[in-house]
């Protein structure tokens, strides 16, 4: 799996933006990716030092359109803590 396939997109929420000020970034990642793979991908793609990673599996929600019921896909979220004083400049403009 390519490093660019592991990182899907940054999480866009108020809580994620508040974490950016403390050097904590949140990303949606491939559900099959492991913590060492995620760490290597973040370090190589953004050129930063990752100090810690927390991951969580987010189950898909039940959605309904009229009488038809379906489910959103299950996702995996990674919360990445960077070394002191480091930032991901590509995401700083979004906050």
From Swiss-Prot:
GO MF term set: rRNA binding; structural constituent of ribosome
Matches recorded under Gene3D superfamilies: 3.30.70.330
Annotated PANTHER family: 60S RIBOSOMAL PROTEIN L23A
NCBIfam families: PRK05738.2-4, PRK05738.3-2
Quaternary structure note: Part of the 50S ribosomal subunit. Contacts protein L29, and trigger factor when it is bound to the ribosome.
Gene of this entry: rplW
Protein name according to UniProt: Large ribosomal subunit protein uL23
Record InterPro entries: Nucleotide-bd_a/b_plait_sf, Ribosomal_uL23-like, Ribosomal_uL23/eL15/eS24_sf, Ribosomal_uL23_CS
Signal peptide: none
Pfam families: Ribosomal_L23
rRNA-binding as UniProt keyword: yes
Function according to Swiss-Prot or TrEMBL: One of the early assembly proteins it binds 23S rRNA. One of the proteins that surrounds the polypeptide exit tunnel on the outside of the ribosome. Forms the main docking site for trigger factor binding to the ribosome.
Native source species: Deinococcus geothermalis (strain DSM 11300 / CIP 105573 / AG-3a)
